[in-house]
Amino acid sequence: MMYFDWNEEKNKQIKAERNVGFEDFVQAFNDDKILEIIAHFNKEKYPTQKLFIVELNEYIHYVPFVRDNEKYFLKNIIPSRKLHKLYKKDL
């Protein structure tokens, strides 16, 4: 069974800056709130990363991640005005 992992220091930083954390993402994932999984915008710089698109705190965020055979390693949680406009019109 796949599980989620992340850097705890990065999680603290994200919580302080954006008032959302990886635990919030995991809850959204478990509640089937993932809107889409897409390739990373910058495939040259991040060829092994993909992005979860998810609504957290009523705003669309993307969560870069790397997947291996046993886990998803979450890299960041980034609010996106562009994705918010794209996805919120459909929600």
Regions found by a protein language model. Give the residues of each.
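Ribonuclease/tRNase effector modules and their secretory precursors
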Residues: 1-91
